[in-house]
From Swiss-Prot:
<feature type="repeat" description="22">
    <location>
        <begin position="797"/>
        <end position="829"/>
    </location>
</feature>
<feature type="repeat" description="2">
    <location>
        <begin position="137"/>
        <end position="169"/>
    </location>
</feature>
<feature type="modified residue" description="Phosphothreonine">
    <location>
        <position position="1287"/>
    </location>
</feature>
<feature type="repeat" description="27">
    <location>
        <begin position="962"/>
        <end position="994"/>
    </location>
</feature>
<feature type="repeat" description="24">
    <location>
        <begin position="863"/>
        <end position="895"/>
    </location>
</feature>
<feature type="repeat" description="4">
    <location>
        <begin position="203"/>
        <end position="235"/>
    </location>
</feature>
<feature type="repeat" description="11">
    <location>
        <begin position="434"/>
        <end position="466"/>
    </location>
</feature>
<feature type="repeat" description="15">
    <location>
        <begin position="566"/>
        <end position="598"/>
    </location>
</feature>
<feature type="repeat" description="12">
    <location>
        <begin position="467"/>
        <end position="499"/>
    </location>
</feature>
<dbReference type="GO" id="GO:0005886">
    <property type="term" value="C:plasma membrane"/>
</dbReference>
<keyword id="KW-0963">Cytoplasm</keyword>
<feature type="repeat" description="21">
    <location>
        <begin position="764"/>
        <end position="796"/>
    </location>
</feature>
<feature type="repeat" description="26">
    <location>
        <begin position="929"/>
        <end position="961"/>
    </location>
</feature>
<feature type="repeat" description="17">
    <location>
        <begin position="632"/>
        <end position="664"/>
    </location>
</feature>
<dbReference type="GO" id="GO:0005737">
    <property type="term" value="C:cytoplasm"/>
</dbReference>
<dbReference type="GO" id="GO:0005811">
    <property type="term" value="C:lipid droplet"/>
</dbReference>
<dbReference type="Pfam" id="PF03036">
    <property type="entry name" value="Perilipin"/>
</dbReference>
Length: 1403
């Protein structure tokens, strides 16, 4: 930065010839120099601010204007400016607008006297026409010391007409009390009105706590459906084990065999636990069922209590047997267990589940979740194996398994879950979900099992069972929670939805309460069923904890959609209060074929403060939707001096004719002190012939280690061979926090869709990192390739984390999606948690591979890797997402973001690389991600995210939103990079992608962060040390009638360092892209954040928009001002700089450029610098000085308005519209002979105009380098030979200001030259050789700019700059040679233009 910590610079020694010598041979330099000399006094930086609003935030030049940013280590283009007066004393960063969606956000926070672990699991969505089944599980943990924790989840779903969806919601809360009172109630109500043919059963198994005793409990679930059954669903969960000097083993074996013609079977079981010392525990289950007319249902509910034994033995089992013989169509079973453990406190947990099924629903939903584990000097192993085989004619199979957590003190814990499903002939749907519970033993042995047997003999259609196991761990106050699952089966429903969430709370000297309210209404003709399950765990030591979950679902008529939402919220508070809420609303209206899923994990760590986090997700799908969504999350584990291993293996094979298969598995998290933790998820899916949908989701939790090692990997493989329509896989790996260790996390997602695939969606996010005296690297690589005919895919995920020490944090996320008519989209969201490790090593990897060969329609994969907290260690995280869709694919959307980093005396690096390639016929691709994080020490932080999406008529778009977390760094360096590449080859209409990463750190201050992304503009963030930080993001999307476009926007939030910030962003775009960067204040050191986006557009693209980077740099002088320089270049011809800034005139102002203007908004170089000294603007109208232009060869004139009107009504060939549809291009060979010559001259006039701009900018660069040379010589005591420079030096009064002025000028001129290059590229469509050379010229300029901007904290290096500038000159000379050849021999493939579109629909 121009203002270093000590405010001094060390002048370098001259290393030979000056830079100016490299410009001497440049042709046209002297002429261009003479040109600009006439307009020297008329240009000023205030002209550059025409695109800046009064607040100092650059307003977008057009609807799609972008603040692209060039890559570099320093926060380059932000110069001292004359923005608002309030910004002058403190560096602030203006932010550009982006109107588009954004993808993926994740956050984690770790504070003093606290620890947070949060795991977020899986997201799945199946697309058009699918008859999917979805299962999801989520697990979360919260720890609070001497505080209050509140967590609420509100999920609303509205399905209006023709919905065929199914939603189920279940939640289980656990409480642990010592010397207190515990009450747990379960209320399950089911109403079946007309013609329903369902059966509901509910069972719960209690918990057992033994001191020096033995406990055994088993869960065995067997389902046999013989003839004519349609659906079978099973869900099991195994809990966690806490052993002190003991051994714990828990196993769950679920076997399902469906022989002939069975369609769907669903079973879910849960077992709970209770631990009470010197207290009272009460558990009640109230199950009411009302069956009115013609119902053929059967309801069974059972629950077993809790047992507390001291030096004894306890055995508890749950046996549920159901036999339905003839004509039964549906059977539903639900079981929940509640565990309570309280130390000198009171805990209350209630579950209210209401279900109303009216007419014709046919679906079944199951949800399961798992608990957590705590181990001290022990070993924990967790494994999950899920195998699915569907042979012939099967339509849907869903399986989800999760493994719980284990808490061991000098012991060993092992938990395994084996789920096997075999569907032989004609089966349509099978869903299974298993989770493992938890056990707390002191010097003893515990075994817990659940046995659920269901036999449906003839003609049964549906069977649903739900069971969950809870967990309890208490050392004077521990709670680990369970899962509650609700199921509604109506009539004629075809879809299945499952949602699970777990919320854990750990409170010391507080109060804990947990309640769940689930309401479901299905009115007429709905064919869907929705299930939602959440587990809430509470750990209270002499305190109270409250957690609430509200889930409302409404399915009206004929809808065919499925919605699933899962969230995990972890809160760790020391002497504070934490609140977290989640609101999920979904509406499906008319004809829409979309599916929306949203999952978020929010982790909060507060020491002596308050935390509040809210999530609001709204989705509206109108009519005829046919989609399915699933979301799962995993929890966390805490281990001291032990080793933990957790693995999840999910294998799915669908052979012939299968339509849907969904699997969801999540593994818990581990916290180890001086131990080793390993976690892996392996998900393989193979769909051979005719399969339509396959969904798999797995996620691994988080690991917390002290002086240990943690490894986590996720491997997801999907192969779809022939005729498959949909495949969805989601995997997430947890987070890791290491002190004095190393953490590595990688995510690799590969997708290959060959022929006829319609949709592929992948989203990966990496969490956040907290490092003290270490190094953190985070990388995200997302590649998308859509070749032919792809239409739309959407994926959205957001995670938020907050780290506060003695402060307050509030975070909210609001995601709204509205799809009105005919939409065919799918949305999925998943996030992962975080981990805390001290003096250990953590490695986490996620590998997701998908191959779809022929005829596949939809494939969705989502993987996320968690966060890492390292003290004096190293953390590396990478996400690699590759997508390849070859022919016939309709839509592919991928969004990934890397999280945040918290480092004390360390270095953090984060990169995001998003590559999108759309080749032929692709219609829409949308990705949206935002990263916002807040880390506050002794302050307050608030963060909100509002994402609104509206798709009205006939839209075929997809929206994805994801956000990743933030970083906290003290006295070190943080680097974050975002690289977005987009390639659109042929016939693509619109593709927009944007990503941003950001972080906020406040020391002894208050931070408020809100994300506000609108189609027009965004507002920036302010960072203050001992101050306030605000960030807002608003994302709105409106798609009207028949629109086939996709919009993507990204915003990077701000970072405030305790002693330094350095931010740089570099973006190169040939595709419509938007990036928004927020940046903050610096104390002494630097944070580097870079965003690099490189899209490329090829021939035949309908609308490609090229944005050049906005660059910003903050200076810490008294008058230093962080400003924003924005350059935007669009594929359609833009009005000249002279028009934009009044520096001249062009012969013909072009109306088609009114809204797509290539512009630059820049503030003054410094408050003390005069306007004249700021330099000239490179863009000068080529007709402004005709006398000077005579020596430059033939000057071509553009077509007049009359000529263009004649061309518009002619019978010319196909026309390629610009992005704003205000102008168009035509292939030169397709023009009539009468128009060909003038069109050729018209195109050349634009090329010449851009050439003159580039030459002028190069000439000024030469002069600027000369001034730089003299400035450095003056610093070494030499005389300044230029009087004007002496004057400037006297005015500024310091060498630092001189160097800053020279550097600012170099950056500005590089920007102007880059803009000229970009405009040239837009005029060279259809000329790949020339475009390649132009790209090389821009690349060489970007390297030069990187050198200039990266030297912000030291002197410019003459030798390096000389070499780079020589490369710039050489590349430009090569480009001019090709342009000369183009003038002599124009190829017929050249897309000439732009020509103004005529009104009245003539085009």
């Amino acid at each position: 930065m121009s203002a270093s910590g000590d405010g001094t610079r060390v002048p370098p020694k001259s290393k030979g010839k000056t830079l100016s010598s490299f410009f001497g041979s440049l042709p046209g330099f002297s002429s261009a120099r003479n040109l600009v000399s006439h307009t020297h006094s008329s240009t000023s930086t205030k002209d550059l601010q025409t695109a800046t609003d009064p607040s100092g935030t650059p307003a977008p030049s057009s609807k799609v204007s972008t603040n692209s940013q060039m890559a570099g280590d320093a926060a380059g283009l932000l110069q001292p400016s004359e923005q608002t007066a309030g910004d002058k004393d403190m560096g602030s960063f203006s932010v550009t607008s982006s109107e588009d969606a954004f993808s993926g956000v994740f956050g984690i926070m770790d504070a003093a006297k606290g620890m947070v672990q949060g795991g977020l699991g899986a997201t799945q969505s199946a697309l058009v026409g699918t008859k999917e089944a979805v299962s999801g599980g989520v697990m979360g943990a919260v720890g609070v010391a001497k505080g209050l924790v509140k967590g609420g989840l509100d999920t609303s779903k509205n399905v209006l007409t023709n919905t065929k969806d199914t939603v189920t919601t279940g939640v289980m809360g656990a409480a642990n009390m010592a010397k207190g009172t515990v009450q747990t109630g379960l209320d399950t109500t089911k109403s079946v009105v007309m013609g329903t043919k369902d059966t509901v059963a509910t069972g719960l198994a209690g918990a057992v706590n033994v001191a020096k005793g033995t406990i055994q409990g088993g869960l065995d679930t067997t389902k046999s459906v013989v003839m004519g059954t349609k659906d079978t669903v099973t869900t099991g969960l195994t809990g966690a084990v806490n052993v002190a000097k003991g051994v714990v083993q828990g196993g769950l074996d679920t076997t399902k065999s469906v022989v002939m013609g069975t369609k769907d079977t669903v079973t879910t079981g849960l077992t709970g636990a209770m631990n009470v010392a010197k207290g009272t525990a009460q558990m009640g289950i109230d199950t009411s069922k009302t069956v009115l007319t013609g119902t053929k249902d059967t309801v069974c509910a059972g629950a077993t209590g809790a047992i507390n034994v001291a030096k004894g033995a306890a055995q508890g089992g749950l046996d549920t047997t159901k036999s339905v013989l003839i004509g039964t169509k549906d059977t539903v079973t639900t079981g929940l267990t509640g565990a309570v453990n309280v130390a000198k406190g009171a805990v209350q947990g209630g579950l209210d589940t209401t279900k109303s099924v009216v007419m014709g629903t046919k679906d079944t939903v199951t949800t399961g979740l798992t608990g957590a584990m705590n181990v001290a000097k022990g070993t924990a192993q967790m494994g999950l194996g899920t195998s699915k085989t569907v042979l012939t004619g099967t339509k849907d199979t869903v399986c989800a398994g999760l493994t719980g957590a284990i808490n061991v003190a000098k012991g060993a814990a092992q938990g395994g879950l084996d789920t096997t499903k075999s569907v032989l002939m004609g089966t349509k749907d099978t869903v299974t979900t298993g989770l493992t519970g938890a056990v707390n033993v002191a010097k003893g042995t515990i075994q817990g099992g659940l046995d659920t047997t269901k036999s449906v003999v003839m003609g049964t259609k549906d069977t649903v069972t739900t069971g969950l196991t809870g967990a309890v761990n208490v050392a004077k106050g521990t709670i680990q929670g369970g899962l509650d699952t609700t199921k509604s089966v109506v009539m004629g429903t075809k879809d299945t939805v499952t949602t699970g969430l777990t919320g854990a709370v750990n409170v010391a000297k507080g109060a804990a309460q947990g309640g769940l309210d689930t309401t479901k209404s299905v009115v007429m003709g709905t064919k869907d069923t929705v299930t939602t399950g959440l587990t809430g765990a509470m750990n209270v030591a002499k305190g109270t904890a409250q957690m609430g979950l509200g889930t409302s679902k409404t399915v009206l008529t004929g809808t065919k959609d499925t919605v699933c939402a899962g969230l995990t919220g972890a809160i760790n508070v020391a002497k504070g209060a934490a609140q977290g809420g989640l609101d999920t609303t979904k509406s499906v209206l008319m004809g829409t074929k979309d599916t929306v899923t949203t999952g978020l994990t929010g982790a909060v760590n507060v020491a002596k403060g308050t935390i509040q986090g809210g999530l609001d997700t709204t989705k509206s799908v109108v009519m005829g939707t046919k989609d399915t969504v699933t979301t799962g999350l995993t929890g966390a584990v805490n281990v001291a001096k032990g080793a933990v291993q957790g693995g999840l293996d999910t294998t799915k094979s669908v052979v012939m004719g299968t339509k849907d298969t969904v699997t969801t598995g999540l593994t818990g998290a581990l916290n180890v002190a001086k131990g080793t933790a390993q976690m892996g998820i392996d998900t393989s899916k193979t769909v051979l012939i005719g399969t339509k949908d396959t969904v798999c989701a797995g996620a691994t939790g988080a690991i917390n280690m002290a002086k240990g090692a943690a490894q986590g990997g996720l491997d997801t493989t999907k192969s779809v061979l022939m005729g498959t329509k949909d495949t969805v896989t989601t995997g997430l790996t947890g987070a890791i926090n290491v002190a004095k260790g190393s953490a590595q996390g990688g995510l690799d997602t590969t997708k290959s869709v060959l022929i006829g695939t319609k949709d592929t969606v992948t989203t990966g996010l990496t969490g956040a990192l907290n490092v003290a005296k270490g190094t953190v690297q985070t990388g995200l690589d997302t590649s998308q390739r859509v070749l032919t005919g792809t239409k739309d895919n959407v994926y959205a995920g957001v995670t938020g984390a907050v780290n506060v020490a003695k402060g307050t944090i509030q975070g909210g996320l609001d995601t709204t999606k509205s799809v009105v008519m005919g939409t065919k989209d799918t949305v999925t969201t998943g996030l992962t948690g975080a981990v805390n490790v001290a003096k250990g090593a953590v490695q986490g990897g996620l590998d997701t591979t998908k191959s779809v060969v022929m005829g596949t329609k939809d494939t969705v994969t989502t993987g996320l890797t968690g966060a890492m907290n390292v003290a004096k260690g190293t953390a590396q995280m990478g996400i690699d997402t590759s997508k390849t869709v070859l022919t016939g694919t309709k839509d592919t959307v991928c969004a990934g973001l890397t999280g945040a980093i918290n480092v004390a005396k360390g270095a953090t690096q984060g990169g995001l690389d998003t590559t999108k390639s759309v080749l032929m016929g692709t219609k829409d691709t949308v990705t949206t991600g935002l990263t916002g994080a807040i880390n506050v020490a002794k302050g307050a932080a608030q963060g909100g995210l509002d994402t609104t999406k509206s798709v009205l008529l006939g839209t075929k778009d997809t929206v994805t939103t994801g956000l990743t977390g933030a970083a906290n760094v003290a006295k070190e360096t943080v680097q974050m990079g975002l690289d977005t590449s987009k390639n659109i080859l042929m016939d693509t209409k619109d593709s927009i992608c944007a990503g941003a990463t950001g972080a906020i750190t406040v020391v002894k201050g208050a931070a408020q962060g809100g994300l506000d992304t609108s189609n027009a503009a965004l507002t920036g963030t302010m960072d203050t040390a001992k101050g306030t930080v605000q960030t807002s993001l608003d994302t709105s999307k409106h798609m009207l009638i028949g629109m086939k476009d996709t919009v993507c926007a990204g915003v990077t939030s701000a970072m405030n360092m305790a002693k330094g910030i350095h931010k740089n962003t570099d973006t190169t775009r040939d595709t419509q892209s938007s990036v928004l960067a927020h940046s903050g204040n610096v104390a002494t050191n630097a944070i580097h954040t870079g965003v690099h986006t490189v899209p490329s557009s090829l021939s035949g693209s309908h609308s490609i928009i090229c944005h050049e980077p906005s660059i910003y740099r903050a200076t810490n002088h008294g008058v230093g001002q962080a400003i924003l320089t924005s350059t935007e270049s669009l594929c359609c011809e833009t009005s000249s700089f002279s028009d934009k800034y009044g520096l001249g005139h062009v012969t013909e102002p072009r109306a088609d450029t009114k809204t797509l203007v290539s512009g630059m908004a820049s503030s003054a170089c410094a408050a003390t610098r005069s306007v004249e000294e700021c330099g000239q603007l490179a863009a000068t109208g080529f007709a402004a000085l005709p006398d000077e232009l005579k020596g430059l060869g033939d000057i071509f004139q553009p077509m007049t308005t009359e000529e263009q009107a004649q061309l518009a009504v002619s019978e010319s060939g196909p026309r390629v519209l610009s992005a704003d549809r205000g102008s168009y291009y035509i292939r030169l060979g397709d023009l009539a002979p009468s128009f060909r010559q003038r069109a050729f001259e018209h195109a050349l006039s634009h090329i010449q105009h851009n050439q003159f701009q580039a030459r002028a900018a190069l000439a000024q660069l030469q002069e600027a380098f000369q001034m730089t040379d003299m400035t450095m010589e003056a610093a070494c005591g030499k005389l300044c030979s230029d009087q004007s420079l002496n004057t400037m030096v006297e005015a500024v009064g310091s060498h630092e200001m001189r160097a800053s002025v020279a550097q600012d000028r170099l950056c500005t001129l590089a920007h102007q030259l880059h803009a000229a290059y970009s405009s040239l590229v837009t005029s060279l469509q259809g000329l790949p050789e020339v475009q390649q050379q132009a790209g090389q010229a821009r690349h060489s300029l970007c390297k030069l700019y990187g050198l200039v901007s990266s030297e912000a904290g030291s002197e410019l290096q003459t030798e390096q700059l000389a070499q780079s500038s020589a490369g710039v000159v050489e590349a430009w000379q090569g480009l001019e040679v090709l342009l000369e050849k183009l003038q002599q021999n124009p190829p017929l493939s050249w897309l000439v233009g732009p020509f103004t579109s005529m009104p009245c629909g003539q085009l």
